[in-house]
A protein has these predicted regions:
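Short, flexible turn/loop "capping" segments at secondary-structure junctions
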Residues: 4-7, 29, 62-66, 137-141, ...
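Acidic/histidine-enriched segments that form metal/cofactor-coordinating
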Residues: 49-160, 181, 307, 323-345
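Stable alpha-helical elements in mature extracytoplasmic
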Residues: 25, 29, 45, 49, ...
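Flexible, glycine/charged-enriched surface loops at secondary-structure junctions
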Residues: 198-205, 275, 315-324
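His/Glu-rich zincin catalytic helix
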Residues: 1-56, 72-75, 85-87, 158-263, ...
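C-terminal regions of mature proteins
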Residues: 130, 171-174, 323-401
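Extended amphipathic alpha-helical segments enriched in small hydrophobics
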Residues: 291-319
Length: 401
């Protein structure tokens, strides 16, 4: 997508090789694979590849999310061809040498050890285990399972690259100072020989919580408790997703524009932070409220959050609150559209999940069209107050309510 007045181009290359497409029962393979891909190619080692990138004054990173592995970066428009060649070299012909796996394994295990001491990470993992059954791709954080990381073999890494990193289902988005025709030619030159693999495919059973589930995990030497309260959300392709985004904003997404955020943090001072997110991916990602609180305030913060949720479910939503939530979402969208990276991200989401070529233009109107009745219906259907998962991590936690 061409954006006038710029000298740079933002690039996003998404491949359906994230958590959702990992080998069953092997959480962590996707992340190990992408990290190993950055450790050199069949043409040059990691240092030489990095030097070539630096010579262009460009940036690049490769991350694994719940749905995709995403190569993201930026270069000057004049260097786009050379930049795409470097990206293709890493994606299509990584060396994936045994020593590369050992390097990323060591770093990943060190990160896992650090996360064991981090109350946010501990609470998030505990919540996932409460919510998702064994074998579900979202039961584990993207960093993976410690045993899988320790035992992963280079053959698994190469197999995941072969089976998951391929052009089928992959999307390249370029936004910024570019001529569309020329950009297509450069992309074709860089990736035209990329082949192999079959379209990714995986299905998981719907996740439904049958009761309230609660777990408290003691993390030594901590003074703050972190809370994750949530439910399995909606797949991004669900036609109700935009309504759910508005409901999320009304509920707790933001301390300025959301009820729980305002009351729990600003009015009552029960939390250091409060926010909620709804994950947009191929399956039911987390719809979760996250809070950091003084351990003495854990039960009250949870109770007040449920009180605000019950008000929403009962239809006690002020017109101003709904308008503020819609304005906040549209405002975030407009801010994103001011940068090439933001535009690229929106186009990428639309392409990955089949939201339509007019998604960027239609999305603000869809947000504005969400009514109070829509929010109540979403909260009633997807945020039951008697069926949820609640995880707390920190010092000794008071008994459950």
């Amino acid at each position: 997508m061409a954006i006038p007045g710029l000298r740079s181009v933002s690039a996003l290359l998404a491949m359906e090789a994230g958590q959702f497409f990992e080998p069953a029962g092997r959480p962590g393979i996707a992340r190990l694979t992408t990290q190993a891909m950055l450790r050199g190619t069949t043409k040059r080692d990691a240092r030489a590849w990095s030097d070539a990138l630096d010579a262009l004054g460009a940036s690049a990173r490769l991350d694994v999310g719940s749905h995709a592995a995403v190569f993201s970066g930026q270069s000057l428009a004049d260097d786009l061809g050379a930049y795409l060649d470097l990206v293709a070299e890493t994606v299509v012909t990584p060396a994936l040498a045994p020593e590369s796996l050992e390097f990323v394994r060591a770093h990943t295990l060190a990160e896992i050890e650090e996360q064991k001491k981090d109350t946010r990470s501990v609470a998030d993992q505990a919540w996932r285990e409460l919510t998702y059954p064994p074998g579900h791709p979202f039961r584990t954080r993207s960093i993976g399972d410690e045993e899988v990381v320790r035992g992963a073999a280079i053959g698994e890494i190469r197999a995941h690259h072969r089976d998951g990193i391929h052009p089928h289902g992959s999307v390249l988005v370029l936004a910024g100072a570019l001529d569309p025709g020329r950009a297509f030619e450069l992309a074709e030159r860089a990736f035209g020989s990329w082949s192999g693999g079959d379209p990714a495919g995986r299905t998981v059973a719907p996740v439904v919580l049958d009761a309230a589930r609660r777990r408290a995990v003691v993390v030594p030497d901590k003074t703050q408790a972190d809370i994750v309260l949530g439910w399995p959300g909606l797949p991004r392709r669900d036609p109700r997703f935009t309504k759910a985004q508005v409901a999320n904003m009304v509920f707790a997404a933001d301390t300025f524009a959301s009820r729980a955020g305002q009351v729990v943090r600003d009015e009552l001072g029960l939390a250091y932070y409060v926010f909620s997110t709804i994950s947009g991916t191929a399956a039911q990602g987390p719809w979760a409220v996250r809070m950091g609180v003084n351990p003495e305030n854990v039960e009250r913060a949870i109770a007040v959050t449920f009180t605000e949720l019950k008000k929403i479910r009962d239809g006690a939503i002020a017109d101003d609150d709904l308008a503020l939530a819609r304005d906040k979402l549209v405002g975030e969208l407009e801010v994103g559209r001011e940068s090439p990276g933001g535009v690229a991200g929106m186009v990428l989401e639309a392409e990955l999940f089949g939201l339509g070529d007019d998604h960027l233009d239609r999305y603000p109107r869809d947000i504005r069209a969400v009514t109070k009745a829509d929010v109540v219906a979403i909260a009633s259907a997807l945020l039951p107050i008697d069926r949820y998962a609640l995880a707390i991590a920190g010092p000794e936690i008071p008994p459950g309510r």
